[in-house]
């Protein structure tokens, strides 16, 4: 059965230049083969994978601190839904955003104008998840008592032993071992978080984990900042799986980088193909 998938997918593998011994290697070794071929140091990649049908897991550098970027916006949104479910927040009320914290004044000012100074929680959810913008994320955090308070609550969805149990607010570091637990919690409570799933199902069409999977439903939360390019995803292949994939310095990106590195992005996207293809060959038939 594995060989049948290899044969069926051979043309695309060859076209992309991403042919590996998928049916004989572990997931980590497949990823390492890709990194070796393209001269990427193993320390630049961390991932955690979980097959949702079998419960089987795989990982590489999963406790290594990695820059989270905007991936924090997923558990942040989950916290706000929890408060709505408890009856503590309204989905229809519009909240003043003129005085919220922000990262970029131009973005903040544009939101104030666009929404006449106030946003509802559904607006904040959509714009923080579909477009991954910061102003609506700060507005969500304000509903919880501010960003510092929100980060203190991230342990609700999982934690790991070590210096960074969840996501560290100070230097924006996390681990894929933590983030895959967030994805797992989200999927196990998908009815409660159906709005969040809808938005991350709509996010970044044709990009990140969706690039090579146009016919597969993918729920994804990408994160980019400086040297980091990441994506957390729930991939609904025949056998669905979770993947937290974080990277550092791909394509020569540095902590001084202010734009997405094109080569680095291509390398990350190729890695999404490699991971998904390994899954197709080894787990879809399970």
Predicted region positions:
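Active-site SXXK
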Residues: 55, 66-97, 128, 243
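Charged, often glycine-rich, active-site loop that binds/positions anionic groups
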Residues: 60-64, 103-116
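Acidic helix-start/capping segments at beta-turn-to-alpha-helix junctions
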Residues: 23, 92-108, 129
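Short, conserved catalytic-motif segment at the N-terminal edge
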Residues: 41-65
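Structured C-terminal helix/loop/strand segments within mature extracytoplasmic catalytic/sensor domains
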Residues: 1-39, 57, 65, 142, ...
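Extracellular/periplasmic catalytic domains that process cell-envelope and extracellular macromolecules
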Residues: 39-41, 88-89, 117-121, 212, ...
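Bacterial peptidoglycan biogenesis and beta-lactam-recognition machinery
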Residues: 41, 81-93, 145-152, 156-162, ...
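Active-site-adjacent helix/loop patches that line small-molecule binding or acyl-intermediate pockets
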Residues: 11-28, 99, 113-192
């Amino acid at each position: 059965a594995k060989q049948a998938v290899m044969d069926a997918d051979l043309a695309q593998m060859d076209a992309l230049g991403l042919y590996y011994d998928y049916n004989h290697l572990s997931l980590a070794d497949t990823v390492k083969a890709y990194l070796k071929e393209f001269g990427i140091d193993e320390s630049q990649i961390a991932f955690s994978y979980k097959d949702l049908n079998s419960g089987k897991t795989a990982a590489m550098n999963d406790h290594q601190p990695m820059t989270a970027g905007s991936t924090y916006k997923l558990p942040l949104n989950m916290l706000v839904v929890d408060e709505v479910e408890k009856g503590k927040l309204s989905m229809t009320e519009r909240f003043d955003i003129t005085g919220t914290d922000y990262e970029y004044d131009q973005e903040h000012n544009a939101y104030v104008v666009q929404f006449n100074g106030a946003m509802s929680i559904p607006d904040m959810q959509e714009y923080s998840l579909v477009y991954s913008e910061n102003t609506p994320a700060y507005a969500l955090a304000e509903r919880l008592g501010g960003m510092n308070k929100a980060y203190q609550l991230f342990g609700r969805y999982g934690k790991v032993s070590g210096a960074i149990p969840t996501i560290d607010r100070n230097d924006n570091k996390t681990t894929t071992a933590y983030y895959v637990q967030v994805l797992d919690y989200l999927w196990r409570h998908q009815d409660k978080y159906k709005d969040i799933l809808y938005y991350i199902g709509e996010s970044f069409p044709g990009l990140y984990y969706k690039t090579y999977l146009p016919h597969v439903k993918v729920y994804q939360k990408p994160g980019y900042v400086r040297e980091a390019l990441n994506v957390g995803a729930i991939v609904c292949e025949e056998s669905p799986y979770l993947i937290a994939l974080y990277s550092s310095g791909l394509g020569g990106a540095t902590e001084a980088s202010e734009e997405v590195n094109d080569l680095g992005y291509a390398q990350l996207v190729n890695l999404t193909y490699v991971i998904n293809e390994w899954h197709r060959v080894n787990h879809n038939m399970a």
